[in-house]
Amino acid sequence: MAFNTPTLSTLIKQGEQQFQYRFPTLKRHNVIGVINRICAALSAGEHMHLDWLARQIIPTTAEEDYLIEYCLYKGIVRKQASTATGLVTVTAANDTTIPAGTVFEDTNTGLTFITTQETVVKAGTADIAVKCETTGVEGNLKAGTSLSLTSAILGLLPTATVKVMSGGADIESLSRLLARLIYRVQYPPAGGASHDYIRWATEVPGVTRAWCFERYYGGGTVGVAFACDEREDILPTPEDIARVRAYIEGHKNEVTGQFEGMPANVELYVFAPQFQAVNFKIRLAPNTPTLRQAVRKSLAAYLANAGVGALLYLSQIRATVSNTAGEVDNSVIFPTADVQLLSDNIAILGDIEWL
């Protein structure tokens, strides 16, 4: 039976009833009434504290500090913000030494990137390693982005071009941390089961979803695909794939300090899924811009929850449209049947034709 926390007015009334029962001849407007209200206020404070404490016991309702502590108890560490690293292409007029700590700036965002080691480049173009001085996903600049030297170097052109920049991630949101905790509870570690590979992949900063394929290329092989939904381009880069692969192959558990990872004698294939756009034709009532946008969001969320190579059931597509708030009637004209994604593809929302 659910317990309803009594309100202050309820506690005052209960106190008045108790005093009236025990002192039936007590007159109104006396000091007992004041004492009753003071006691009721103290009791209300205790009830509110107990109500708050009860929410902290359950991870799904706990506040940040308590959720993090509960996750640590289960061996899960909140993923901290990470720094983007990569390569920039510079052009030198002659043999030039680029010192470690040389700073390049993206004038559009104000982000700065610093060289990680001293590099000697010959006349022409060369790629040098840099890292962003700011943590977070914003450091993952697109290839071709122009950077400027903050201090001139003799023989080096003042501009550089991003060749690749990845690995930057924001601190893990509480909702994603909670999702990993629930997954850990529902699928305990099993020494190399398919859900272990999913758990390991999603422990890497920036990785939000992962899929595991047993016997990917036959016996003794495992395939792992993943996505990075917090970024503008959610598909992993080769550098992301290398990081996830290295983590799955072996890493030190931050909580226990023990080494863990995939079993020996397993051939691991880590790859980036590909996009497969799914188009729709929908007759909608009421056919308003607001409802269209709501249906678009509902379909995008449905497709995002589908896995790699998933089968998209037409009945679920219809239900997704029907369950959108504000919808009165609809007909899904296209697709006309279930949609089978290709084996290494994930679904994204394509074009919607409103009829």
Curated annotation (Swiss-Prot):
Organism domain of life: Bacteria
InterPro entries, sorted: Baseplate_J-like, Phage_Baseplate_Assmbl_Protein
Pfam families xrefs: Baseplate_J
Family: Belongs to the Mu gp47/PBSX XkdT family.
Protein name (record): Mu-like prophage FluMu protein gp47
Organism: Haemophilus influenzae (strain ATCC 51907 / DSM 11121 / KW20 / Rd)
Lineage per the UniProt record: Bacteria, Pseudomonadati, Pseudomonadota, Gammaproteobacteria, Pasteurellales
